[in-house]
Structure formats: structure tokens, C-alpha cells
């Protein structure tokens, strides 16, 4: 795992899961995509900060759980520089906490799901169309199952047989 790195940027010390838990998610995604070296910035921000970012980059004036920015290597940058850098992920822990409560999910499970979701965006996956969404969701379900986490797209009542 020495070749996989998450740069945690959490200036306000928002509560987050263990770094090992999130590194395990990166390892799963990297293994699935035959990536041996990867680096990601994980920015932990407040609801206000993510709302500003969401408004600026997505024209949506509301907080969201995650925003991913895939790295695009500038022209002229030598191939051996920044090859491993996938991009930046911005997460608002308070949004994740509220979603986990509303959806009756374990908070760490939800964190892992959303972080994997963001990593897949950095690798070019999207969910704009139904077909793209199905591919991305199926991959998320498969990766989460390897972590022992239930399908996040099934209502909690359905998972409990109610």
C-alpha cells in the first residue's frame, strides 16, 4: 500500500473515519483497475464550504456530500511528473452524517460508499445517463460487497425484509 496515498486536508479537524479505512477503499478501487500507484487529495470541509464549491463548479446552490475533481495533466508537463495523481475529492462530513441517519446506514459504511463513489469519478466514471449510472452503481455495489457492506441503493427496509 506504500504506492497508494491519500493526502488528508482537514484544517478544521472535522470528524472522519480512520485513514486506514479510506486507504482500504483506495486499495480496492486501485486493484480493480490494475493501478499500482495512486495519489488523491481528500479535502474535508464544512457544509458552507461545499455549498460554495457546488455553486461555483456545478451551479447548484446547496450543500452536497461529495465533489470530485479529476486531475487533468497540463500540456507540456513531463510524463513522469504527477502520473500517479488522480485528483481531488471534497467531502462534507456533516452531510454524510445526516444522510446516514436519514437512510439508517452505518456512518463508516456510508463514508466508504461515498469515498469509493468519488474515486470512481476520478477514474472517469459518471452517472449522467441511465446506462452510465447503472455501470457505476454496479461497480460500487461490487466493491462495497468486498468490504462486507450491503448494497447502498436498496432501501434499508428491503434489506431487513420489511
From Swiss-Prot:
Keywords linked to the UniProt accession: Cytoplasm, Endonuclease, Hydrolase, Metal-binding, Nuclease, Ribosome biogenesis, rRNA processing, Zinc
Residue sites binding Zn(2+) per the record: 117, 121, 127
Transmembrane stretches, start-end: none
One Pfam assignment: YbeY
Cofactor, free-text remark: Binds 1 zinc ion.
EC number: 3.1.-.-
Superkingdom: Bacteria
Protein name (database record): Endoribonuclease YbeY
Provenance organism: Francisella tularensis subsp. mediasiatica (strain FSC147)
